[in-house]
């Protein structure tokens, strides 16, 4: 767009520099003059008709009204599409032809005992400690009706129990098990009692 200079004599186009370095003189502009680059290009009726159709505006219709009508039409289409999606989501999908649909199984899953679940959940180190503890518990059970055993054999059994308790303690110190449950703690606490029994048997004179 041309820039004009205003003076007491009227409007002027300022001097401009040519590519070769020379200057064009300032030119006076008459009233009502429109520069060539600002003159709108002529478009025939047919060209205007094609341009309006490409823009989505019906021939002879105001562009603003056409834009509003287009927005309203797009809004209605979106609303209709959302409604169809909701209705299709409520209806169950039909199985493909030739596909046999089996009803959900009513058979209960196989039962797993609580002991088996605990063994599966426990790490190998914990299972080893529990196994040793179980063996120790069985050996610590004394039968009241049992006859008096040989002190040498009894001493041998008590020493075996001490070795089993020490195995549990070594596993705890090695970090294979962070803490013991109540039963395991009770078994470890019996170490002093077993040591006392061993001491008594060792001090008892043998016949």
UniProtKB/Swiss-Prot annotation:
SUPFAM superfamilies linked to this entry: Pym (Within the bgcn gene intron protein, WIBG), N-terminal domain (SSF101931)
InterPro entries, sorted: PYM1 (IPR039333), WIBG_mago-bd (IPR015362), WIBG_N_sf (IPR036348)
Where is composition skewed (Polar residues) in this entry?
Answer: 123-133
The primary location reported for this protein is cytoplasm
- GO CC, any one term: exon-exon junction complex
Where are the residues of the annotated region Disordered? 1-28, 52-133
Record GO terms (molecular function): exon-exon junction complex binding; RNA binding
Describe tissue expression. Expression detected in the ovary. In the oocyte expressed in the germarium, nurse cell and follicle cell.
User: Effect of gene disruption?
Assistant: Viable and fertile. No visible phenotype.
Q: Which UniProt keywords apply?
A: Coiled coil, Cytoplasm, Nucleus
Q: Which residues form a coiled coil?
A: 64-91, 152-184
A Gene Ontology BP annotation from the UniProt entry: nuclear-transcribed mRNA catabolic process, nonsense-mediated decay
What job does the chain carry out?
Answer: Regulator of the exon junction complex (EJC), a multiprotein complex that associates immediately upstream of the exon-exon junction on mRNAs and serves as a positional landmark for the intron exon structure of genes and directs post-transcriptional processes in the cytoplasm such as mRNA export, nonsense-mediated mRNA decay (NMD) or translation. Acts as an EJC disassembly factor by disrupting mature EJC from spliced mRNAs. Required for normal localization of osk mRNA to the posterior pole of the developing oocyte.
- Spell out the family assignment given in the record's similarity comment: Belongs to the pym family.
The annotated subunit structure for this chain is: Interacts (via N-terminus) with mago and tsu/RBM8A; the interaction is direct.
**What name does this protein carry?**
Partner of Y14 and mago
**Gene name on record?**
Pym
């Amino acid at each position: 767009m041309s820039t004009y200079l205003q003076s007491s004599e009227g409007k002027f186009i300022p001097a401009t520099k040519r590519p070769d370095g020379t200057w064009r003189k300032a030119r006076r502009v008459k009233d009502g003059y429109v520069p060539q680059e600002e003159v709108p290009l002529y478009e025939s009726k047919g060209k205007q008709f094609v341009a309006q159709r490409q823009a989505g505006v019906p021939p002879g219709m105001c562009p603003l009204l056409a834009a509003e009508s287009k927005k309203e039409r797009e809004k209605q289409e979106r609303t209709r599409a959302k409604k169809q999606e909701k209705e299709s989501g409520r209806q169950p999908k039909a199985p493909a032809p030739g596909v046999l649909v089996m009803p959900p199984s009513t058979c209960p899953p196989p039962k797993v005992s609580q002991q088996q679940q605990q063994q599966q959940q426990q790490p190998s180190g914990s299972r080893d400690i529990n196994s040793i503890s179980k063996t120790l518990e069985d050996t610590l059970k004394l039968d009241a009706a049992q006859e008096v055993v040989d002190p040498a054999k009894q001493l041998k059994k008590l020493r075996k129990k001490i070795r089993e308790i020490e195995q549990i303690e070594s596993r705890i110190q090695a970090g294979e098990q962070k803490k013991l449950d109540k039963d395991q703690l009770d078994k470890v606490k019996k170490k002093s009692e077993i040591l006392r029994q061993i001491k008594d048997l060792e001090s008892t004179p043998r016949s």
